[in-house]
A protein has these predicted regions:
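Active-site-adjacent alpha-helix of alpha/beta-hydrolase-fold enzymes
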Residues: 289-307
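N-terminal cap/lid segment of alpha/beta-hydrolase-fold proteins
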Residues: 24-58
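Cap/lid segment of the alpha/beta-hydrolase catalytic domain
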Residues: 54-137, 321-327
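Short beta-strand/loop motif that positions the catalytic acidic residue
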Residues: 272, 278-280
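Bacterial N-terminal signal peptides
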Residues: 8-19
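Alpha/beta-hydrolase fold nucleophile elbow
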Residues: 140-152
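Glycine-rich nucleophile elbow surrounding the catalytic serine of serine-hydrolase chemistry
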Residues: 150-160
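Accessory cap/linker subdomain of secreted extracellular hydrolases
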Residues: 79, 88, 110, 118-128, ...
Length: 328
């Protein structure tokens, strides 16, 4: 005779799910908005927004997000759908502009270099470390436990913390993160320059520190614009005029030389230093290489089994803005 207990448990589970679904959704929590300038080890201060529940139920963990694209300018009018469930669990949300972006001081390098041997160096890993140190000491009602979460560039600024994590960093989820810009992330596909990506992206991040600048094409058909452009040197000769540092560096280093090897921060990763959930898309047009390299390198030493990856048939970051249950 078959055991009927699994069927009974399944029936009870389905009844429970139906009961929960029938309940009214919980009211969105109200958040206190605070903007601060957090000092780094070299004196530069980074623009940071702290969103704290007005009526917290005890000390809360901090969920930290570092981005080059801008921080919230006002309190949530409604909770963004991508963090709705996290908000219901109870977090202090912290969003920070990277060094040199918007009100953050210093120079934005659009660089992934990390020099673990130079105690005076500043980079995305040290800026995250210094920020977490400040947050756990200065944000009221936090429980000294920090998590980090991000997709794409914010996935990178999350993943790079694996190299030198702050003791208060307890878990991360790096998603669609680049790891090697020459091999097969963002700017190159195994050394072949993605011209139609790098030009626009470098302009967006480095033309004006106070906004995300969109390159103004002269034609609607971007593909045709690049066909008509001619030589790669015409990008600077006709349009950028040497004003975008990252574009200059990219075209000055067409081969996999020391410049790109130093940018490949993942080559310094040899262990899973923080419990981490990596997310990758099989159809990621931007970063098909990074998530797997991060996962592979973190697995070199993972005695506590804290290194995980989830992958699906998604384009770049598709799962973050929706359910991720369909393509297109």
């Amino acid at each position: 005779m078959r055991n009927k207990r699994p069927a009974s448990f399944l029936a009870l589970f389905l009844l429970l799910v139906a009961s929960i679904a029938a309940q009214q959704p919980a009211a969105a929590p109200t958040y206190k908005f605070e903007e601060v300038m957090i000092p780094m080890r070299d004196g530069a201060r980074l623009q940071t927004v702290i969103l704290t529940p007005v009526d917290p139920k005890g000390a809360l963990p901090i969920l930290f997000h570092r981005t080059p694209y801008g921080v919230p300018k006002r309190p949530f009018e409604q909770i963004p759908p991508e963090i709705k469930e996290l908000a219901q669990d109870g977090y202090i949300f912290v969003v920070q502009n990277l060094r040199g972006r918007f009100k953050s001081e210093g120079q934005f390098q659009l660089s992934f270099r990390v020099d673990l041997n130079d105690p005076k160096a500043t980079n995305e890993a040290t800026d995250a470390y210094d920020s977490i140190e400040w947050l756990v000491k200065n944000v009221p009602n936090n429980n000294a436990r920090v998590g980090m979460l991000g997709v794409s560039y914010a996935g990178l600024t999350t993943a790079i913390c694996l190299l030198h994590p702050h003791p208060a960093l307890k878990a991360i989820s790096e998603q669609a993160s680049p790891a090697n810009e020459w091999m097969n992330d963002d700017e190159h596909h195994f050394g072949a320059l993605r011209e139609s990506y790098v030009v626009e992206y470098a302009v967006m991040e480095q033309a004006d520190k106070n906004r995300n600048t969109h390159f103004e094409f002269e034609t609607y058909d971007t593909y045709q614009w690049y066909l008509d452009l001619g030589s790669l040197s015409n990008v600077n000769a006709k349009y950028l005029h040497g004003s975008i540092p990252h574009w200059n560096s990219t075209v000055q280093h067409p081969d996999y030389d020391e410049f790109w090897k130093k940018e490949a921060w993942v080559n310094q990763l040899h262990s899973s230093t923080v419990p981490n959930l990596n997310v990758a898309g099989f159809w990621d047009q931007e970063d098909p290489w990074g998530p797997w390299e991060i996962f592979r390198n973190a697995a070199i030493s993972d005695p506590e089994r804290t290194n995980f990856i989830v992958a699906g048939p998604w384009f770049h970051g598709q799962w973050y803005g929706g359910k991720g249950t369909a393509l297109g």
